[in-house]
Amino acid sequence: MRLLLDTHVLLWWLADDPSLGEEARTGISDPGSSVFVSAATVWEVSIKQALGKLEAPSDLLHQVELNRFEPLSMTVSHAYTAGALPRHHDDPFDRMLVAQAMKEDLVLLTGDPRMSSYGVETVAA
């Protein structure tokens, strides 16, 4: 399975937070899964850390590498798709994740039920 982690899912995984459900844990830990972390997620975390609004690992990039997650860059196509999405969700980072999941044929692991309103395949976190 090709999985894209929503920001909170990445942070829950790294913290071994019990908020992360069993289905999501199984998908992430499955050796047959390719697990992607978007540049948008890293950007969101770094912005919120700098503003003092979020506690996250100070070595986030190292943690992504240690977990063998694959980085997913943002492209012009992703940006255009994110901007053209219906207004179900106004968070620009979440809209980017939806666009990336659509364009790259990824399953989005998220705890946000609004994400599925875009028609992208999701797994509840």
Question: Where are the language model's segments positioned?
Answer:
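Helix-loop "lid/cap" segments that line or gate small-molecule binding pockets
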Residues: 48, 65-68
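A generic structural signal for short
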Residues: 12-13, 48-49, 85-86, 100
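Short glycine/serine/threonine-enriched helix-capping/active-site loop
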Residues: 37-38, 74
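Phosphate/NTP-binding elements of NTP-utilizing enzymes
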Residues: 45
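Active-site neighborhoods of divalent-metal-dependent phosphate/nucleic-acid chemistry enzymes
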Residues: 57-61, 69-114, 120-125
